[in-house]
């Protein structure tokens, strides 16, 4: 989907108005759970514009989650352009991204949000939201569920300039999103997305899409 697509639904603004790293409150007011308003938003905006990620979640049998600080029930946001590492070494994060770029990956650590199908992991970072990336997003994942880059590990990729050495260590992929969701690995999402508060809409979405929730 083009980033300049104009949306006419009353809950929307132009997608191009969302700046990198920005989140905009959208949809029903936090003062009350308005089922009718949310169903309008879901059917008219989220379903058609997030069909790729919805299908991946259904095929993977799980939702994608992200934890962040917010009290709003529905948020639309966009990934970062220059995300700062939280738990990883800064220089290694730059090297990691450099290697991903050399291998042709578009979603890297510094320009993405991190999502996971592990609700427990998402809760560690803040309020839990179910994430539906908007069509046209890029993604990358590795076999790791919670990757923190530390110089203490002294792996070969840290000193080698050969992208294949990096590849053999991390085996990054940008296909079969449903597999990544099912396996519960950390996924980098580059693009725009809807975030729906888990404790408000989790049960509704579970019944709507036939996707189970964590026990």
Predicted features and spans:
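Aromatic-enriched hydrophobic runs in primary sequence
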Residues: 4, 10-11, 65-66, 118, ...
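Active-site and NAD+-binding cores of ADP-ribose-processing enzymes
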Residues: 21-43, 69, 77, 133-215
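Glycine-biased, low-complexity coil/linker segments
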Residues: 3, 8-9, 15-20, 145
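A generic structural signal for short, non-catalytic loop/turn and secondary-structure boundary residues
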Residues: 1, 57-60, 124, 180-182
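ADP-ribose/NAD+-binding catalytic cleft of ART/PARP-like enzymes
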Residues: 12-108, 196, 206, 212-215
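ADP-ribosyltransferase catalytic core
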Residues: 61-62, 97, 101-163
């Amino acid at each position: 989907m083009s980033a300049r697509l104009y949306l006419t639904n009353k809950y929307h603004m132009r997608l191009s108005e969302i700046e990198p790293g920005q989140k905009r409150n959208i949809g029903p007011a936090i003062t009350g759970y308005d089922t009718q308003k949310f169903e309008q938003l879901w059917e008219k905006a989220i379903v058609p514009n997030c069909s790729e990620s919805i299908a991946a979640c259904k095929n993977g049998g799980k939702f994608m989650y992200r934890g962040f600080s917010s009290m709003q029930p529905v948020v639309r946001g966009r990934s970062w352009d220059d995300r700062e590492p939280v738990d990883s070494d800064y220089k290694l994060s730059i090297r990691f991204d450099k290697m991903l770029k050399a291998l042709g990956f578009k979603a890297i650590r510094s320009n993405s949000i991190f999502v996971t199908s592990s609700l427990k992991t998402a809760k560690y970072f803040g309020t839990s939201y179910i994430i539906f990336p908007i069509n046209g997003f890029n993604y990358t994942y590795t076999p790791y569920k919670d990757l923190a880059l530390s110089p203490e590990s002294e792996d070969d990729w840290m000193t080698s300039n050969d992208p294949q050495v990096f590849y053999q260590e991390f085996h990054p992929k940008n296909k079969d999103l449903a597999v990544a969701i099912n396996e519960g690995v950390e996924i980098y999402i580059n693009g725009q997305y809807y975030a729906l508060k888990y404790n408000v809409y989790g049960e509704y979405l579970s019944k709507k899409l036939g996707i189970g929730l964590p026990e």
